[in-house]
Amino acid sequence: MAHMVKCVKLGREAEGLEEPPFDSELGQKIYNNVSAEAWRGWTEHQKMLLNEYRLQPWKKEHQEFLVQQMEAYFFGEGSEAPKEFVPPSH
C-alpha cells in the first residue's frame, strides 16, 4: 500500500515519498507532509535555482541556501525564481 499524505503544497491527499529524502528532522517533515508529485515540482524548481544562481552544491553556503529555499517552497511563503529568470517556452 502506498504511503499517503495530506500534501502541504497541493492541499490534498496524495501519494507520498517512498522514504524520507534525507536523514534529518526536515527530511522526516517532508516525508510526512509532502507528496511525491510536489517533490518532483521541487526538484524542477531546485534545478532552476542551481542554474540561475550558478550554485555549486558541494559548497556549504549553497547547500544552506537550497535548504532555506526548500523550507520556503513547502512550508513558507514559497521559493521565488530570480527576477531575471525567463521560463522556457514549450
Curated annotation (Swiss-Prot):
One Pfam family from the record: Iron_traffic
Alphabetical UniProt keywords: Iron
Stored InterPro entries: Fe_traffick_prot_YggX (IPR007457), Fe_traffick_prot_YggX_sf (IPR036766)
Biological processes annotated in GO: cellular response to oxidative stress
The keyword Kinase is annotated on this UniProt entry: no
One cellular-component annotation, GO: cytosol
Keyword Iron: yes
MF annotations from Gene Ontology: iron ion binding
Family recorded in the similarity comment: Belongs to the Fe(2+)-trafficking protein family.
Functional note: Could be a mediator in iron transactions between iron acquisition and iron-requiring processes, such as synthesis and/or repair of Fe-S clusters in biosynthetic enzymes.
Name this polypeptide is given: Probable Fe(2+)-trafficking protein
Protein's organism: Koribacter versatilis (strain Ellin345)
Lineage, highest ranks first: Bacteria, Pseudomonadati, Acidobacteriota, Terriglobia, Terriglobales
